[in-house]
UniProtKB/Swiss-Prot annotation:
EC numbers: 2.7.4.25
UniProt record, GO biological process: nucleobase-containing small molecule interconversion; pyrimidine nucleotide metabolic process
Entry's Gene Ontology cellular component terms: cytosol
Span of the signal peptide: none
Origin organism lineage: Bacteria, Pseudomonadati, Pseudomonadota, Gammaproteobacteria, Vibrionales
InterPro entries linked to this entry: Cytidylate_kin, Cytidylate_kinase_dom, P-loop_NTPase
Organism for this UniProt entry: Vibrio parahaemolyticus serotype O3:K6 (strain RIMD 2210633)
Name of this protein: Cytidylate kinase
Length: 226
């Protein structure tokens, strides 16, 4: 068995179920959790809280370097704790999203956040949720999973989520949005969405979440025992 801190990466397209899988894996393994998709929103929110200009690299880099954030799996949700405060609700606000877009466009800030994400690698272990965790952020991770599902299945899942919230949405619109996002993610010049060469590819299209978790755990346990 390797003496290094165990790292499990889960990458994949939007709507494949990465968040749910990572939360359940972190709880079952007793590992820490990193939601890389939320990290830019967290930094943007920290900037807003501290009155820092979200377009100033010089001001944002030290904030990113020392970002005090935790992701805690609790019940069916992941709580985001920024500087000791639960900011899960604030992260979803439009103001935070707009600020995050500005922050994400700054190269030195991206580099600082890359280092900050790598600092999550600590005992007893880490489950990292994202799009380039196994290819860019943690290329030496012992267990890498690429969780996929058909665009149609992901649109169906999203449709059900939104309908459960009482929203009136069309399947065709959701499918189109997902296909466009897939195209952007897979063809972007920096860190395109793709499985790491040594990743287990899981297609969850016709699998239940319990089946996905079982397959993932079998794979992780075998990799960590090597």
């Amino acid at each position: 068995m390797s003496s290094q801190t165990p790292v499990v990466t889960v990458d994949g397209p939007s709507g494949a179920g990465k968040g749910t899988l990572c939360m359940l894996l972190a709880k079952k393994l007793g590992f820490q959790l990193l939601d890389s998709g939320a990290i830019y929103r967290v930094l943007a929110l920290a900037a807003i809280h501290h009155g820092v200009d979200t377009e100033s690299e010089d001001a944002l880099v030290p904030l990113a370097t020392h970002l005090d954030v935790q992701f805690i799996a609790e019940g069916d949700l992941v709580k985001v704790i920024l500087e000791g405060e639960d900011v899960s609700g604030e992260l979803r606000k439009e103001e935070t999203g707009m600020a995050a877009s500005k922050v994400a466009a700054l190269p030195r800030v991206r580099e600082a956040l890359l280092r900050r994400q790598r600092a999550f690698e600590a005992a007893p272990g880490l489950v990292a949720d994202g799009r380039d965790m196994g290819t860019v952020v943690f290329p030496s991770a012992q267990a890498k999973i690429f969780l996929d599902a058909s665009a149609e299945e992901r649109a169906n899942r999203r449709l059900k989520q939104l309908q459960d919230k009482g929203l009136d949405v069309r399947f065709a619109d959701l499918l189109s949005e997902i296909q466009e996002r897939d195209d952007r993610d897979r063809n972007r010049p920096v860190a395109p969405l793709r499985p790491a060469e040594d990743a287990l590819v899981l297609d969850s299209t016709s699998m239940t979440i319990d089946e996905v978790v079982e397959k993932a755990l079998q794979y992780i346990e075998s990799k960590l025992a090597e």
